Curated annotation (Swiss-Prot):
The keyword Signal applies. It comes from the Eukaryota. Disulfide bonds: none annotated. This is Lung adenoma susceptibility protein 2. InterPro entries: Cell_Prolif_Regulator, LAS2. Residues 1-31 form the signal peptide. One of its GO terms (cellular component) is extracellular region. Pfam families: LAS2. Keywords: Phosphoprotein, Secreted, Signal. Widely expressed with highest levels in lung and spleen. Also expressed during embryonic development, at least from 7 to 17 dpc. One of its GO terms (biological process) is negative regulation of cell population proliferation. The modification Phosphoserine is found at S161. It comes from Mus musculus.
Length: 526
């Protein structure tokens, strides 16, 4: 049977993992089934059936040594007993008599215990399990964890009931339902928060009887202060966590007390008081409900004690020595009123509280109406509807209509476009002759007008040739007579024919002559 007797320290990073795996491979490679069935591994005096379990234990120990460098090595025996070890890396152990000689007023300050238990909060590296073990108010648990107790992952949840009862690391955590005349029984829980053991028999307290013994009035005693401070500490939930639980959208959180009313009801003194008969009746009705939050049960228990203290302070024949106790009682009551901020199971709207609520609502409405700005008169700032319904001058643009032009209907037949253009050209030409052309003035036609004039001149010349062709025979047309030249000279006086036109006409006449000569010479040869 292969055994690996290695003692690993908490902070040692030079552990022989290879030797551990080698021993496991040797034991697992044996062909004999009897030897392989009985093979086991020993790591820190703990037997493991396989090498994987031993390796996992080594990994867990190594991770723990890195998270808590100051922690000692944990030695787990085969019988499940837990050896020496610290719960936290920077946790300071406090003896049982550490809270004997303390100022009573310091018990209400959770920061006092925080300074006592841990010197430097930033130096602590807590895991998720450690954070879950802390109470709701953020300070460490009142009965500290002894140094010889640290649960192992392998044997967590396997402790016997005898070990749980004998373990000194248990404290009072929660209570069950209780009536007005019975103190809620205590339930023993371990450090993991699991309930175990049997509850203590309830101790009867008569609420109606106002006589209190001297033992109950021994206010400065250490036991009463430690008990009250422990109860006060367990009830100190933050307001952001208890005021609006429905808004958190957290389904798995069950330790947060259910809150039905906001905090402003308590600030406005709208919650029912337990001293009034109606409030006492409501408390009785609420406590018989099947589901009751932990905070309500603690508050009812504290109210029973407060009523006893208040009755003892009321007689006027008491000496001045009780004035300090009365001040402490009032302070204790004020602090005990804090858990009742939401008013978990109490009905706030009862009796005269409804009238007070209505009056305060009316007052708030009046104040809000006064704070509103006054409506502005129409003269200063017109309403938007008036602006929208008004006429839009930019849309009604005046349209300028032109006067109708009369159409001249003449009975005479219309002339052709050519004759009209020629007449207009002649009129312009005659008007232009009357005007003296000077270097500085005078009408000068543009290029477009000049082209038009040239076109008109060519058209007139073409018309004249066409007329001559129709009236005279071809032979007479070929020979230019003197009469035609005289007519052309007359037309030159009437129309401004340019030199180019003259040259063009001359070239045309010569070309015709040449054509006629060539045609006449070729005809007799044929």
């Amino acid at each position: 049977m292969a055994k690996l007797n290695t003692k690993l320290r908490g902070c040692s990073q030079e552990s022989s993992v290879s030797s551990l795996l080698a021993s496991g491979s040797l034991s697992g490679s044996r062909s004999d089934s009897a030897h392989s069935a009985h093979s086991s591994f020993v790591y820190k005096d703990q037997l493991y059936s396989s090498a994987s379990e031993a390796l996992q234990a080594y990994i867990d120990d190594f991770d723990l040594s890195r998270e808590h460098p100051g922690a000692n090595a944990v030695k787990v025996n085969t019988d499940g007993e837990i050896g020496n070890g610290l719960q936290f890396s920077s946790y300071v152990h406090i003896p049982d008599n550490a809270f004997v000689n303390l100022d009573p007023k310091q018990h209400f300050n959770p920061l006092y215990y925080r300074r006592e238990t841990v010197n430097d909060m930033d130096a602590i590296s807590l895991t998720t399990d450690d954070l879950l073990r802390l109470p709701a108010d953020g300070c460490f648990s009142f009965p500290c964890v002894p140094p010889d107790h640290r649960p192992n992952k392998k044997y967590s949840g396997r402790q016997d009931s005898s070990d749980i009862k004998n373990s000194p690391s248990f404290y009072v955590d929660a209570t069950s339902k209780s009536k007005n005349n019975i103190v809620p029984p205590y339930v023993y829980t371990n450090i993991n928060g699991k309930k175990c053991g049997r509850p203590r028999t309830p101790k009867p307290i008569n609420r109606e009887n106002k006589c209190v013994s001297e033992s109950s009035l021994s206010f400065p005693k250490e036991s009463s202060f430690t008990e009250d401070s422990a109860e006060r500490r367990l009830e100190n939930y933050p307001r952001w966590l208890t005021s609006q639980k429905s808004d958190l959208s957290v389904s798995g959180v069950t330790s947060i007390p259910d809150v039905k009313y906001p905090i402003w009801l308590h600030n406005q003194d709208l919650l029912p008081e337990a001293n009034t008969p109606r409030g006492y009746k409501l408390l009785n009705e609420d406590e018989y409900r099947p589901i009751h939050s932990y905070q309500t049960q603690r508050a009812n228990q504290l109210l029973n004690k407060i009523d006893c203290f208040e009755y003892t302070f009321k007689p006027s024949n008491l000496t001045d020595s009780f004035s300090e106790y009365e001040g402490l009682g009032n302070e204790f009551k004020c602090q005990c009123d804090n858990p009742l901020l939401p008013g978990q199971s109490q009905k706030p709207f009862c009796g005269d509280k409804i009238e007070l609520l209505i009056l305060k609502a009316k007052k708030n409405l009046k104040q809000s109406a006064k704070d509103l700005p006054k409506p502005v008169e129409k003269d200063d700032s017109p309403c938007s509807l008036d602006k929208l319904e008004a006429e839009r001058t930019w849309e009604n643009v005046p349209v300028a209509f032109k006067s109708p032009v009369p159409v001249k209907a003449d009975d005479s037949p219309q002339q052709s476009s050519r004759t009209q253009c020629v007449n207009a050209f002649l009129e312009d030409f005659l008007n232009g002759e009357n005007q003296s052309s000077t270097l500085s003035g005078g009408k000068h036609h543009g290029p477009v007008e000049a082209l038009k004039q040239m076109l008109f001149n060519l058209q007139t010349v073409q018309e004249s040739f066409n007329k001559n062709k129709t009236t005279e025979p071809e032979e007479e047309i070929k020979q230019v007579s003197e009469d035609d030249l005289a007519k052309l000279q007359m037309k030159e006086n009437m129309m401004p024919i340019t030199r180019s036109l003259h040259k063009a006409l001359q070239h045309l006449s010569r070309l015709r002559d040449l054509v006629d000569d060539t045609s006449g010479r070729q005809s007799p040869k044929k």
